[in-house]
A protein has these predicted regions:
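Short alpha-helical
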Residues: 113, 142-145, 167, 197
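Short gly/ser/thr-rich secondary-structure transition/capping motifs
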Residues: 51-56, 82-90, 160-163
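N-terminal targeting signals for export/organelle localization
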Residues: 1-82, 218-219
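Conserved segment of the thioredoxin-like fold in thiol-based oxidoreductases
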Residues: 117-120, 124-164, 177
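Thiol/disulfide oxidoreductase modules built on the thioredoxin-like
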Residues: 100, 149-157, 164-219
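Short beta-strand-to-loop junctions in surface cap/lid or active-site-entrance loops
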Residues: 93-98
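Hydrophobic beta-strand anchors of alpha/beta hydrolase catalytic cores
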Residues: 104-105, 135, 180
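Conserved redox-active cysteine motifs that mediate thiol-disulfide chemistry
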Residues: 99, 107-124
Length: 219
């Protein structure tokens, strides 16, 4: 049973890689998000824990899932590895800690043109919706010192995580920069978008998420 499960998971990831190879995504202007938009509605977000960008905590992302038997993602070969949402390390960010309210995740990297500047947009919207919506900015595979300097120079106060080896970006099918995931409370995907957004456009996505959350809770 485990062998068959491993084969299915392997084929799924291979399919995502093939699609990513055949589709070139350019920054800005929107378009389809590889991976995220191909997933079904209410897709449960994979658990992960990463170092906070400005912290002194070092290491790669922890993507060990809580339940290896029912997870749609492979678990680490080391069965003793602590699941991401069970770690308690100073300077770490766990995605599950954001699941108590609607959540926006921004995936980005400095090689993606103006992606760093797009986080200024996220910061402004974060300030507008602070308390009612969670925000997580996740830098993928950049130099850590460069990230720390960006946080300092831009004055970001929103949570900023660091995905050093790109494990989280791979799990989430990030195919362009910036990629945004809009998430229901509890950690299931509501929608996704790719490309640069204005404050008004990102706020529009947040409002749509809030309305969808209200409808879901009323049903």
């Amino acid at each position: 049973m485990r062998d068959r499960y491993s084969i299915v998971v392997g084929l799924l990831f291979l399919a995502i890689i093939v699609v990513a190879t055949l589709n070139t995504i350019e920054g800005g202007g929107g378009g389809e998000t590889l991976g995220l938009e191909q997933l079904p509605a209410r897709w449960p977000l994979p658990e992960f824990a990463v170092p906070a960008g400005a912290s002194q905590l070092e290491g790669d992302a922890n993507v060990a899932q809580d339940d290896c038997e029912t997870s749609s993602l492979p678990c680490p070969e080391d069965s003793q590895r602590t699941p991401a949402c069970r770690i308690h390390l100073a300077g770490s960010i766990r995605v599950c800690d954001f699941f108590d309210k609607p959540l926006v995740i921004s995936f980005w990297f400095t090689k993606g043109g103006g992606c760093a500047d797009q986080q200024d947009v996220v910061q402004q919207v974060f300030e507008r919706y602070r308390g009612s919506v969670g925000f997580l900015s996740l830098d993928i595979r950049d130099d850590r010192d460069t990230l720390r300097e960006s946080i300092r120079q831009h004055g970001w106060t929103m949570p900023v995580g660091y995905d050093r080896d790109g494990a989280v970006g791979s799990l989430y099918g990030v195919g362009g920069c910036p990629t945004f995931a809009y998430v229901y409370p509890g950690g299931t995907l509501q929608s996704a978008s790719i490309g640069d957004l204005t404050v008004a456009q990102l706020s529009g996505h947040v409002e749509a998420l809030l309305k969808a959350t209200t409808r879901a809770e009323a049903s």
